[in-house]
Amino acid sequence: IQWILTVMAKHTGKLVIPAINFGNDSSQFAAIVVNDSSQVNNTNEDLFLQVEVSTTEPYIQQQVIYTLKLFRRVNIAQASLTEPELADALIEKLGEDTNYNTQFQGENYVVTKRKYAIFPQKSGIATIIPLSLTAGVIIPGQRRSNSFFNQQRTRTKQVVSAAIKLDVQAKPENTGVDWLPAK
């Protein structure tokens, strides 16, 4: 029996993964260095996220279209993606995801696009926190030997999008009691 334990760092720095005990067996400890993901350039990556908004200066309660694009040159399994979050806002997913092929910086990618409608409910500076994708990247040509289910080997990868700042404008003074922002 072989046990595989996947760990994800919660912060940067020099970290020690302690020895893991299971019955009479014990692993070795491991010392690692975790770098800030913002220092990693997403270009030429096999897997990355891009996010954009229709406007960075909406009025209060105005619809902002938030578009997420997952670029990948690898096959993934067991993916988990966080949802967009913005304090004092209503957020709703729009439609179904779309998939297409594209070239980005000379490389071919499969892109999955997802859209959300965000309605800020409070004026002022607000930040849409970064989205996080955790996925098993399938290692080509490697299957678990003697596996009853013939599962493919994966390595866990986590990618994070950029944060987006919104400068939400208060409703104009001459609008009266009823307010419905529109384009």
Describe each PLM feature range.
Residues I1-K183:
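Surface-exposed interaction/ligand-binding surfaces
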